[in-house]
């Protein structure tokens, strides 16, 4: 991981306070629209009995919803421990503690320690990681069937907005950076690991992309 994004920087952005806020919103309103788009697509592909690996899943809401929809087990890999307590509370409330394995590590750097799954999800994760090919390649290698990813669209206004955000983070001396990795490179990297695109759905900010393991 580059010097721009240290564990300290991630913990400042993805804090315990942020986790509690996300959990409160999920309990009241359910999934946000981008996460719902992921769930809706996965359901069309068949989720019954499938295993799920989510990298950077935060409070674990997507995992919970897929397990409720029929997935057999889920694996969660988080870069920082700040979401673990709240995620555990949500699992206990849903009665799903024994069906989710949670761990804290840099997935891209320690992917060999993580089991593969039928469905792998990277929701709003690629834009927070400097080494896109390493992260995307590791995720693709772990996807036995489907890889779902979301990342910001490369519009002019997002480039300006995120650029200003990065300047502000630098001025505040926060060790964090937001990346607008080229979507074509993200998809090409996945293709190098045996996956074929099956979905490219653009929202106002986020693109939802899905790739399937080639036959």
Where are these regions (language model features)?
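Short conserved loop adjoining the S-adenosyl-L-methionine
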Residues: 109-114
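A short SAM/SAH-binding and catalytic strip from SAM-dependent methyltransferases
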Residues: 119-131
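Conserved beta-strand signature within the Rossmann-like core of class I S-adenosyl-L-methionine
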Residues: 144-153
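Short alpha-helix
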Residues: 176-194
């Amino acid at each position: 991981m580059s010097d721009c994004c240290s564990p300290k920087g991630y913990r400042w952005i993805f804090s315990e306070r942020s986790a509690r806020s996300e959990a409160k919103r999920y309990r009241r309103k359910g999934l946000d629209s981008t996460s719902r788009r992921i769930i809706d697509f996965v359901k069309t592909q068949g989720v019954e009995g499938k295993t799920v690996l989510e990298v950077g899943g935060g409070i674990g809401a997507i995992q919970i919803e897929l397990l409720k929809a029929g997935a057999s087990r889920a694996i969660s890999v988080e870069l920082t421990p700040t979401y673990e307590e709240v995620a555990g509370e949500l699992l206990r409330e849903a009665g799903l503690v024994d069906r989710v394995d949670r761990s804290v590590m840099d997935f891209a750097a320690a992917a060999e320690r993580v089991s593969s799954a039928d469905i792998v999800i990277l929701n709003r994760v690629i834009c927070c990681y400097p080494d896109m090919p390493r992260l995307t390649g590791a995720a693709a290698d772990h996807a036995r069937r489907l890889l779902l990813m979301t990342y910001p669209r490369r519009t002019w206004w997002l480039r300006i907005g995120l650029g200003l955000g990065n300047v502000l983070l630098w001025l505040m001396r926060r060790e964090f950076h937001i990346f607008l990795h080229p979507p074509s490179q993200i998809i090409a990297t996945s293709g190098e690991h045996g996956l074929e695109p099956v979905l490219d759905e653009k929202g106002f900010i986020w693109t939802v992309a899905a790739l399937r393991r080639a036959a």
